[in-house]
């Protein structure tokens, strides 16, 4: 089997900055990580390789600094890494991103053999659109299984796959033919730790780097901001809120504070309760 895993280097969401003119995320100087859902996708691919053998190629599109995330993926056990990097890709929305990645996946198929499965995370934590995986499948003309929790089985000879998808009503069991694209939810198994041998291999590995021309991109106008019809009207970070803490010396204090807060927001409630208490006392006095 040859499986391709698309990963993305994403900024630390706690330190995101936004360009005031283009409304795109400014990634320079911001700490980055591999998108967590993409790690779940990588773990699913590694699990299949454990069972069926084969190779795993990890692919990302981004600036030269994205090489760091690819090397991290190699430490988990991926066999090779491809970095699609070109200034013309800057500012890509999901439509432009899927065009570039689908083009690179076709090139990977020619260079290293066609993919049986293509994995992505269900979404990225910086965009949260969940559009890239399905968009790649559409451009490649392959089937897709989205929000997959577990790959149950793969029949390589008959080119079929069975997987589980979580839904509000329970678990759906899905069947489709290979090749197909899978977007993964949280991993059902814990993400493995890379072995020391994998870490050493990753440090020495040569990352394959392709420009738009190298990957076979035929229409540059479909890339980057030029190829992105999505208009972001405003991007902003929520204002930071100061956390306040109270020193509690007895169990009665928080209870009294809660009562005071309720009465402050609903002043009529205190009056109504006082009236009920007075009426109750009057009733008891009348019975004596």
From Swiss-Prot:
Keywords: Electron transport, Nitrogen fixation, Transport
GO terms for MF: electron transfer activity
Keyword Transport: yes
Keyword Cytoplasm assigned: no
Pfam family for this entry, one: ETF
GO BP term (any one): nitrogen fixation
InterPro entries to which the protein is assigned, alphabetical: ET-Flavoprotein_bsu_CS, ETF_a/b_N, ETF_b, ETF_beta_N, Rossmann-like_a/b/a_fold
Purpose of the protein: May play a role in a redox process involved in nitrogen fixation.
Family the entry assigns: Belongs to the ETF beta-subunit/FixA family.
Binding partners and assembly: FixA and FixB form a heterodimer.
Protein name as it appears in the record: Protein FixA
Species of the source: Bradyrhizobium diazoefficiens (strain JCM 10833 / BCRC 13528 / IAM 13628 / NBRC 14792 / USDA 110)
């Amino acid at each position: 089997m040859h499986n391709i895993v698309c990963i993305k280097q994403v900024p630390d969401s706690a330190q995101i900055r936004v360009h005031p003119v283009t409304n795109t995320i400014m990634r320079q100087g911001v700490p980055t990580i591999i998108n967590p859902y993409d790690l779940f996708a990588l773990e699913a691919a590694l699990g299949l390789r454990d069972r069926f053998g084969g190779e795993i190629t990890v692919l990302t599109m981004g600036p030269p600094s994205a090489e760091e995330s690819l090397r991290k993926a190699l430490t988990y056990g991926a066999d090779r890494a491809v970095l699609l990097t070109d200034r013309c890709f800057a500012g890509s929305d999901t439509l432009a991103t899927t065009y570039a990645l689908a083009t690179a996946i076709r090139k990977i198929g020619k260079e290293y053999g066609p993919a049986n499965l293509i994995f992505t995370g269900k979404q990225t934590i910086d965009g949260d659109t969940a559009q890239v995986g399905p968009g790649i499948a559409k451009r490649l003309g392959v089937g897709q299984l989205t929000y997959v929790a577990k790959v149950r089985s793969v029949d390589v000879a008959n080119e079929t796959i069975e997987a589980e998808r979580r839904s509000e009503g329970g678990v759906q069991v899905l069947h489709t033919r290979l090749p197909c694209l899978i977007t993964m939810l949280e991993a059902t198994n814990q993400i493995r730790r890379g072995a020391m041998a994998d870490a050493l291999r990753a440090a020495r590995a040569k990352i394959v780097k392709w420009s738009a021309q190298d990957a076979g991109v035929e229409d540059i106008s479909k890339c980057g901001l030029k190829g992105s019809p999505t208009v972001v009207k405003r991007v902003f970070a929520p204002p930071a809120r100061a956390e306040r803490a109270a020193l509690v010396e007895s169990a009665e204090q928080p209870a009294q504070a809660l009562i005071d807060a309720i009465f402050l927001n609903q002043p009529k409630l205190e009056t109504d309760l006082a009236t009920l208490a007075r009426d109750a006392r009057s009733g008891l006095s009348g019975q004596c």
